Amino acid sequence: MPLSRRELASAPLWLAGCAARRNAVAPPAPVPMSRVRVAPERVIRTIVGLRPFRPSGFVVRGEKLDQKVVIHNYGHGGAGITLSWGTAQLSLAEAAQVETRQAAVIGCGVVGLSTARLLQQRGYSVTIYTKAMPPDTTSNVAGGLWSPVTAYDHERVTPEFRRQFGEAGRFAFRRFQSLVGDGYGVRWLPVYSLSRDSAHQPPPPESANSEIEPLYPDSRQLARTEHCFDVPYVYRRYSMLIEPAVYLNALLRDFLAAKGDLVVREFRDTPDLMSLRETLLFNCTGLGSRELFHDDELIPIRGQFVVPVAAAGDRLHDPRSGRHLHVSAPRWRVVGRQSRARRVRHAGGPGHYGSNPARERGGLRRHANSYNGQGGPLW
């Protein structure tokens, strides 16, 4: 359902890292926001997923294996949706010298689907091979805010990665703008970054994120009279929010409509991949690349989403807090928590993959307490 001007202006969402249209218009005056109604007893569902993180950043490069060329495109961390079109574009550039018009894409998450669609638009005949399809992919439990977050460790960034990161971010920024609308589940929202300690500071010039920061439209620190958050520092920019369930289904629909083939198949190892008939392969397997291609730098990081009961007028947001990055999306009524990278030796084990009730309760309280325009505790 389309948002009214009033709803769009008041829909709060926290997270840095999005590019938005230059002609986005900020609301001329603060709009009253209703209280956030979140509490442990209102939680109806908790979703946990693992993101494929590499401290040195994502991998986009070609490799010759036997008689095949494998183009790797994985390791996006918490920025898979955000960078998907951009790294797909980079991966196609890697394949430009391969003399074939038939390609296999391994993986059917957002990176695999984006890569497959760009291949089709360049005239390739494409088959996706995957062990899981939407709604059962890691991409389906993504937060969906356009934001290059948890994509790399600052200390590990190389000049080449910085070039790729900036190029991928700018391409993806332009591409997502063309998909705004109900059909793809993409829309614009204001983004509020909250702090009790200091005003927003732009990324330092040596940071890879400094390549993305100039894309944000109408970004500025808000005066205390321009918002109703219970914090002294509020920084606003505009971002795109992508609904994974709608978006991934739309990409899959487009792929099949363009006569793409899809085969459900799990690969045990690299030699198993070599049995495919295609000579050009795009590896978009995310965490699967750790086993398939022996990338020991690939680390699973846990993302946890808490879904409270939706209530009319609720608007969710979130501040930065210590070790964890908080995300919230008003359309889902989701309170999310993205933990820092941690090595998971047995991905899926109860100690690593399950939800954390203590974090869930703490996150809910932080949400409620920081959004308190009328004073006093909310619950």
What kind of region is each of these model predictions?
Residues 23-66, 75, 81-83, 89, ...:
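Active-site substrate-recognition segment that forms the wall
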Residues 1-16:
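N-terminal secretory signal peptides and thylakoid transit peptides that target proteins
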Residues 133-168, 224:
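Glycine-rich active-site loop/strand segments that organize a redox cofactor
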Residues 19-20:
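Bacterial signal peptide processing site
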Residues 239-310:
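Predominantly flavin-linked oxidoreductase catalytic cores and closely associated redox partners
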Residues 89-97:
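Internal hydrophobic alpha-helix adjacent to the cofactor/substrate pocket in enzyme cavities
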Residues 11-15, 48-67, 139-141, 171-254:
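Flavin (FAD/FMN) cofactor-binding and adjacent substrate-gating region
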Residues 101-109:
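Beta1/beta-strand and adjacent pyrophosphate-binding region of the FAD-binding site
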